[in-house]
Structures are given as structure tokens and as C-alpha cells.
Amino acid sequence: MLDIYLGVGMFIAIVLALVLIIMFAKSKLVPEGEVTISINGDPDKAITAQPGDKLLGALANSGIFVSSACGGGGSCGQCRVDIKAGGGEILPTELDHISKREAKEGCRLSCQVSIKQDMDIELPEEIFGIKKWDCEVISNDNKATFIKELKLKIPNGESVPFRAGGYIQIEAPPHHVKYKDFDVPEEYRGDWERFGFFDIESKVDDETIRAYSMANYPEEEGIIMLNVRVASPPPNNLSLPAGKMSSYIWSLKEGDKATISGPFGEFFAKKTDAEMVFIGGGAGMAPMRSHIFDQLRRLKTDRKISFWYGARSLREMFYVEDFDMLQKENDNFKWHVALSDPQPEDNWEGMTGFIHQVLLENYLKDHPAPEDCEFYMCGPPMMNAAVISMLKDLGVEDENIMLDDFGG
């Protein structure tokens, strides 16, 4: 019996010793109370934060919203900040997005940086113009089988000062979404039923943040328009998780609330006189529409512009009336559609095939100087890769190839 008591006593003593060691180490490694984060050397911009918080979250808590399309997961590489002091060693998770030269200069991913001491960081001045809005859903309608147009109303008296090609981030609270509750019009339900998509559910326990490009242009004021493709699991494995954010967005109905922040962006048009060639597919339509409307309606440019859009079938086409109208109004604008899998009921007499092949065969191969054009593209990853490869073969330099990774 004495041996048992001694054993229990020794065990308790060891546990207490370990606890004391951990508490001592924590007291040395993590400061108590708040720490100060100096920003751009401006005392008025300095904030305080709790040790152990991530830098991205601490900035957001103080109303400074750094772009993070993945919501802080470390996968998008957008939440870059320059840390001049107090950031510690760069983590392996950051090195996929930050070069050795950039790391040496202090570049870090704010979602991966844990606050341990006072810090000194630098942020672009435009970040301080980023705000958050609680919007109301005006409509959420199918534009194609798997693409909805979400239209949000900005609060009265407010505006989102975005540029064409820009994007916002939208927040989704924890939720449980059942695909059977989605409002899918009869003309699109066939594929949904055939693939068993109405049986899918998406249950998310944490807040989610994702980025979406605007489909409207700056003069369409008071609203934000997004094209959102539902990220369903592949039909041959419906047990895989559905897209967290797209499932949430597809569940939104008129009158619902949605929180956005922004504006953000890098996918902006160059201020030159060069010919502009836009190439899109799928939900990559969004920034294409924003850019083209902005060029022709707001800027009233006389630059030569063409738009090449690829869809599977006629049922997957949208904004046709918009682009037909722009083409009629502007002699310097032409737009073209290619269907990769036209259906018998389409009675399609237009171009067929993948859009990069159609663009090459019907325009670029006979173009006197494709290398002098500016190419703006947004679509599915395979489309983007094929277009870039084709442009490289034509001698187009990187500086004339602009890619939006979010719209597809």
C-alpha cells in the first residue's frame, strides 16, 4: 500500500513540476498584458494586441483589414506585411509564398505571425481605406447551372470605392447548409438531380472569409455584384466536403444580411493605348464585365477591345444582352463566344472548341503584333494555363499578361 501512495505522490509531484516549468517558460517567452504594434512609424496608427494573437486578426480587430482570400489559412499568400522588428523567424509555411530575398527584407504572412512582443510593421497606405459593411441581399439568381449572381445593397449613404477588376472579401458565420434548400430554377435542375447534388450538406463550425471579384463597375453605385460558382464535391465522390463559402452564398435569399470588407485588388487595367484582349470562362466572367463596362461606359475609351468567352453550352452563357448592347454602341468593341459542348437544342452555328484555341485560330495567328496587346484573363485554372502557354508561344511578355485568380 505504501508503494502505491509513493507512486501516486511521485506522479503528482512530477505533474506539478511540469506545470511550474511551463508557467515559468511562458512568463519568460510571452509577455503579460498588451503589446504595441507600431505601424508606418506613425504614433497615431499604432495599435495594441494580446500576446499569442495572430497579426492578421489583431489588425482586423483594430479595423485594419489586410487582404486574405483564404481567411487566414496560409494558402493564398495575400496577407503580406513588412515587419521591421519583433516578428521572429519566418515559418516554413510562409516560404511557399515568400522568396528568400523578400524574407530578408522583412516580408511575412500576417496570418502566420504570432504576436510575442512589441512589433514595428509597415503597411501600404491604401489599406487604411479598407472598410467593412453589413449589406442586404437584393437578389441571388442563377445565371448558369452552377453560377449565381449575388447582388448586395450597400448601406444607405455608404459607398465602396473600388476600381474595375477589384474584389471584396465576404464573411460567412458558422452554418449548416442543405443543398436541397437552394433555389435552383427548373431549367438548371437536370444536372443537379443527375449528379445527386441536392443530397449534399455543408456544415461549418468556424467563421469563413473568401474573396470574390466584382461583376459591376464603379458607376453601378450602391450595389456589389458577384458571380459565385458553387464548389460542390465531384459527382463520383460526394462524401468530400463542399466549398464552405460558395455553399453559404448559394443559401442566401432576398433580405438576408451579408458582411463584406474591401475594396482590394491588383487586377487593374493599365493606362496605355494598347489593344485590350479579355479572355474568360465560368465565373471568371465577373472581372471581365467590370473591366469592359468601365472602359466603355465610364472611361469612354477608344482603345481596341475584344472579349473572348468560353462556355460549355448555350445554357451556361450569361450577360449576353449586356455585351450585345456594348458591341452595338461601340465600334471599337467586339465580343465572341465559343461553346465546348453545344447541345442539340442550342442550334449553335457559332464557334466551338476551347476558348484559347478559338482565339488563336480566329484572331491571334493572323494578328500583326500580338506581343503588343494587353491580355486580361480570368477563368478555370486549366483555361488560364492554356491561354498563358499559348500567349508565351506567340512571344507575349509577362508584363502584358494580367491574370485574376479569384473569378474562376
Curated annotation (Swiss-Prot):
It holds the Pfam family Fer2. Gene3D superfamilies: 3.10.20.30, Nucleotide-binding domain of ferredoxin-NADP reductase (FNR) module, Translation factors. GO terms for biological process: sodium ion transport. The keyword Flavoprotein applies. InterPro entries: 2Fe-2S_ferredoxin-like_sf, 2Fe-2S_ferredoxin-type, Beta-grasp_dom_sf, Cbr1-like_FAD-bd_dom, FAD-bd_FR_type, FNR_nucleotide-bd, NqrF, OxRdtase_FAD/NAD-bd. Residues 33-127 form the 2Fe-2S ferredoxin-type domain. Its cofactor is [2Fe-2S] cluster; FAD. [2Fe-2S] cluster binds at C70, C76, C79, C111. Its EC number is 7.2.1.1. Binds 1 [2Fe-2S] cluster. Keywords: 2Fe-2S, Cell inner membrane, Cell membrane, FAD, Flavoprotein, Ion transport, Iron, Iron-sulfur, Membrane, Metal-binding, NAD, Sodium, Sodium transport, Translocase, Transmembrane, Transmembrane helix, Transport, Ubiquinone. Residues 130-270 form the FAD-binding FR-type domain. PROSITE patterns: 2FE2S_FER_2, FAD_FR. The chain crosses the membrane at residues 4-24. GO terms for molecular function: 2 iron, 2 sulfur cluster binding; electron transfer activity; metal ion binding; oxidoreductase activity, acting on NAD(P)H, quinone or similar compound as acceptor. It is found in: Cell inner membrane. It catalyses: a ubiquinone + n Na(+)(in) + NADH + H(+) = a ubiquinol + n Na(+)(out) + NAD(+). GO terms for cellular component: plasma membrane. It is a single-pass membrane protein. It is an enzyme of class 7 (translocase). PANTHER family: NA(+)-TRANSLOCATING NADH-QUINONE REDUCTASE SUBUNIT (PTHR43644), NAD(P)H-FLAVIN REDUCTASE (PTHR43644:SF1). Composed of six subunits; NqrA, NqrB, NqrC, NqrD, NqrE and NqrF. Belongs to the NqrF family. NQR complex catalyzes the reduction of ubiquinone-1 to ubiquinol by two successive reactions, coupled with the transport of Na(+) ions from the cytoplasm to the periplasm. The first step is catalyzed by NqrF, which accepts electrons from NADH and reduces ubiquinone-1 to ubisemiquinone by a one-electron transfer pathway. This is Na(+)-translocating NADH-quinone reductase subunit F. It comes from Pseudoalteromonas atlantica (strain T6c / ATCC BAA-1087).
